[in-house]
Amino acid sequence: MTGIRECILYRDFEQGELLEKMTMLMEDISHPKVLYGKDGEYFACIHQLVEMAGTYGFAGNLWHDYLTYLLVNHENAFSTACEIVGPVEGTINAFAMQDFEIFKQLYDFDLKELEKIYPSEDSSLITDYQNINEGSKVFNKRIRDRICTLAQKLAKAESTEEFMDDMVQFYKEFGVGKLGLHKAFRIDGTVTPARIVPITNIAHVHLDDLVGYEIAKKKLIDNTEAFVQGRPANNCLLFGDAGTGKSSSIKGILNQYYDQGLRIIEAYKHQFKDLNDIIAQVKNRNYKFIIYMDDLSFEEFEIEYKYLKAVIEGGLEKKPDNILIYATSNRRHLVREKFSDKEERRDDLHSSDTVQEKLSLVARFGVSIFFCAPDKKQFQNIVKTLAERHQVEMPEEELLLEANKWELQHGGLSGRTAQQFIDYLCGKNENK
């Protein structure tokens, strides 16, 4: 068996220690005497595969699942090129074919051969593993299923060419690495340069879940569709009353356009200084990125908005075509102004410049979408719609009466208040 250490493109895996240990055991299979005394290493490998199954939700042939996990996560010159254009031409194909030949040998290896050396059925068990938990601590079910399905295809490949075609198709269709497997990310500024890490537990909110606000949703959809389709689009500011669905709309947009290559990176004010590092990492990838800032506003003493202005406008470098900024805020003017500011501006020789500097951030957002609080009739319509969706059985008159009482005690008229009321009723009914 050719050693994994001879790979050119696919090497230095993040979780490659298990791969090295397993391939060493396989390479030594023709020299049984060498394997004696390595029982601990063998059982440690089985242990790691089972632990990975618990973490990632893998089932079936855990060895194949693990190998597939390595391949779909490895970002190299070949995989990232396939992500953009699909099949590629040139010398790099020869290197990829060589590496896939090695991996095909790993897929084709019969783990039961190891049972001849180590008297146990562990190898057989991990080739038909029944997972007690269908969930995953790292992936959602959709991602886990894609990896397991690809593992089955690769195991059935009759040739290295077919093996390679399956990998190229996966890279083109779903992408490679964390950007290909995940929808949303947060910024980790504890390392230099800052990096993005996946958010694994995403709320499955859809735009249709948001009752009303059809004009606002259409404006958001039109801009986002233009963006994912490669047409000119604008940065978006969603502003208005609290609890009106601004943040839910962003989550809905992500879930609606994820399959078309949309990804979201969540950023907070203290991370604005890291945005240039993040943009540099994603600007050449085959995805559309929305940098999402929730509940954005600035006090008069906060200067982070200047970082944001610089990022939006860009410097000498051309602004990437695959990045937009979407923000939500309860304020139309993001930088707070007070009446006392007028007194201070009397001593400012260029007071109009000072005012314009504070207003200029909003002007960077080409599309502003207003979400206003519903009136009483709209609120009641939201309640009735949500009650029907959640199969709340209650006479309409009683439902609306209780909803009116609820909103008076819990924050007033808003979609959030309506949802909280319905959640209360559902929880109450389940306890009966």
Segment roles from a protein language model:
Residues 294-296:
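Walker B catalytic acidic pair
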Residues 329, 346-359, 366-380:
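Conserved AAA+ ATPase "SRH/arginine-finger" region at the nucleotide-binding site
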Residues 280, 284, 299-349, 353:
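Conserved catalytic/switch belt of AAA+ P-loop NTPases
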Residues 1-211:
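AAA+ P-loop ATPase mechanoenzymes
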Residues 202-236:
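Pre-Walker A (pre-P-loop) alpha-helix and adjacent loop at the N terminus of AAA/AAA+ ATPase modules
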Residues 235-267, 277-283:
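Walker A/P-loop
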Residues 368, 372-432:
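C-terminal alpha-helical "lid" subdomain
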